[in-house]
């Protein structure tokens, strides 16, 4: 069992979560998911390829626009950001082991702190990648996909690949270059493009064609670099219609697939589809899966759900058995997701602040 460097467990008192069947009264047991049970000749673990999102599980604080952080995370004691990031790796892999989850996903800035310069950012990322690599070797856990955070830093206020500032475009390209290299080093099965700020707030001051052309050029550069370093993982494009921008260029599967074909990227990139993003686009998740599947672009999914009564991305854990059945029906219909998987892009609610709540 993974332990922190001081020899203690982050989730002491919680054992490995196991399948106990539908009649179990154990709240920390699987009732329906039996990893080794065969379905259509394949183990359930191979159908799902479950992954934990590093950003929600290990970086979420519970803060919102109306109040500060609520999450109790006893392991967050280091004052040095890099030391804290390296300690967090042990916590993450203990969680993966106890949950029985084979994969994880991350943005570069989830796992390593931002530095004052690009060189410092890369140095920090390399240091954490050392720890991630050792943890993977020790536990057998794998990286489903990596990506770069091109939306949080103020430099990306006008976008990254679509920024009107050439220096911002160049910085973003360098950041993606490094993120792909680290994903490759860690044996990642894929890499995701999600342009959180690749869009507009007002068309009066937006040259849409130019921005979309720049986005395509940016993605071609990433594909070319992947070939140069020998990265053979699958590239994914993740649709989302808005938030934080009024309109985003990766609106839905139809928009993204048209973009990929128009710009000669269709042989390199498939779709990473999120349920809550489909809701924001006015679609059911099954619609997005069917559209991508029939076009040959179904790649991976982010498993969550949204609240149809609110207009933003709530990233709730999926609890609707009819919705999840529809999703799996479409996935099986189109031959499964591998090398993609099912990433739990869902966060515990602000009121669920104890470490054990991560397992529930």
Predicted regions and their residues:
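Short, histidine-centered active-site or binding-site loop motifs used for metal coordination
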Residues: 110, 197, 239-241, 305-307, ...
């Amino acid at each position: 069992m993974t332990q922190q460097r001081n020899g203690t467990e982050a989730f002491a008192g919680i054992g490995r979560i196991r399948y106990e069947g539908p009649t179990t009264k154990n709240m920390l047991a699987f009732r329906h998911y039996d990893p080794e049970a065969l379905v259509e000749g394949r183990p359930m673990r191979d159908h799902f390829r479950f992954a934990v999102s590093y950003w929600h599980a290990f970086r979420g604080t519970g803060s919102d626009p109306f109040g500060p952080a609520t999450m109790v995370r006893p392991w967050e004691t280091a004052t040095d950001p890099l030391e804290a990031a390296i300690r967090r790796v042990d916590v993450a892999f203990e969680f993966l082991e106890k949950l029985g989850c084979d994969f994880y996903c991350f943005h570069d800035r989830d796992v390593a702190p931002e530095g004052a310069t690009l060189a410092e950012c890369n140095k920090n990322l390399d240091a954490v990648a050392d720890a991630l690599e050792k943890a993977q070797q020790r536990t057998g856990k794998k990286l489903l996909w990596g990506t770069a955070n091109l939306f949080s830093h103020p430099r990306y206020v006008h976008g990254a690949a679509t920024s009107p500032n050439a220096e911002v475009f160049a910085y973003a390209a360098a950041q993606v270059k490094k993120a792909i290299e680290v994903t490759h080093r860690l044996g990642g099965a894929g890499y995701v493009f999600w342009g959180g700020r690749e869009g507009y707030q007002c068309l009066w001051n937006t040259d849409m064609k130019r921005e979309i052309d720049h986005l395509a050029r940016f993605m071609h550069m990433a594909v070319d670099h992947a070939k140069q370093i020998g990265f053979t993982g699958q590239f994914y494009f993740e649709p989302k219609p808005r938030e934080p921008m009024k309109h985003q260029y990766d609106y839905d599967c139809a928009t993204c697939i048209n973009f990929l074909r128009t710009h000669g990227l269709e042989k390199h990139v498939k779709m990473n589809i999120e349920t809550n993003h489909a809701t924001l686009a006015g679609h059911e998740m099954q619609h997005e899966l069917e559209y991508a599947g029939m076009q040959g672009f179904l790649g991976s999914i982010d498993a969550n759900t949204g609240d149809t009564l609110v207009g933003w991305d709530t990233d709730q854990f999926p609890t609707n058995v009819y919705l999840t059945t529809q999703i799996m029906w479409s996935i099986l219909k189109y031959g499964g997701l591998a090398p993609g998987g099912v990433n739990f892009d869902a966060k515990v609610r602000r009121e669920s602040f104890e470490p054990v709540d991560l397992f529930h």
